[in-house]
Amino acid sequence: MATEMNELLTNGLDRAVELMVVAAHNSFRFGGRNTVKIARLTTEDQQEIAQFCYSLGDMSPLAARDGRFLMELIKEPCALMMFGDRRKSDLNFNCGACGYKTCAEMNRAEEVESLTARGPSCQFKAINLNIAAGAAASMAWRLGLYCRVFSTLGFASFALNKMENVDMAVTVSVSVAKNDPYFDRHQYWTDEHWKETFNKEFPTFTRGFIGAIEQE
């Protein structure tokens, strides 16, 4: 008996996610140490993340928008991958990018916890984390999947403790929907509301070079 299209799509998505993990696992790492954790979140996890993001409407309208979007996305075959890592450095680069003179000094600093991550954190660990996510997204694109990296869903998955022993996280969402769902999320807002919200959350995007005056 012939295999139904939906089953083929679901099975293909599962195999694609496995290849995305391989690509992320084998991606470049500063320091040559592979400390990034990777997990595929369940549909129930995604529902919880979507509701959490949507609840942040007053604090972060963009997170609320992405939560509403995820609620619609999971109605079709899709997957959400979570990437996480610890904040402390074992690299001993002593580059100062974290704001401390040495890695040891940063590692000894008092931990600060927020909704989105724990800090202070090694910038190279954060770069490694995003390189892994980018490698997974690149593999998804090569396999013909629709894909997008989400920081909003990442910090929501972190806040909800979807992965143990990590201090920062990012997510990669992939879909086999008929049309690309990731770059048409403005359907929930009018153009005026989008501009107002974007200027509120990212005021530096409305500024030019140093010395420019902010829009009133």
Question: What is each of the regions a protein language model found here?
Answer:
Residues M1-E216:
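Acidic, surface-exposed loops and disordered segments
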